[in-house]
């Protein structure tokens, strides 16, 4: 049985982080995806479980995978927003946060951590809006008719007298 979550995690690392394992590793991403399958189940009214992400109707389809991917990205951006406010986002040396220098009248401009955090929060909000949109589309297009009547019901082999 293929490991859907590991394949999805590999895709996230390659496409979203350009394969930079310093940002996220496949193991970390697939672990997060596995631990948060319940969120997808809540949004999509499904029951995916296990490493193969299988449920009542089989393996997790591509639409459900895209919802899980957006949930991961929203979580990642929220975490980065918190880290930016703490001032620890990829800041290894003093001076990493210098934005510009001017020699005339000696001006130094630093990165505004609050603005960086707002950008990350905006990205997280965009991802959650996308999750809501994708979940609604998934639930609409995966819905089965509850009742057949009229012309649709003719020819199904049932005769009412």
Where are these regions (language model features)?
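Conserved short "hinge" loops at termini or chain/domain junctions
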Residues: 1-61, 133-161
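Divalent metal-cofactor coordination and adjacent catalytic microenvironments
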Residues: 27-130, 137
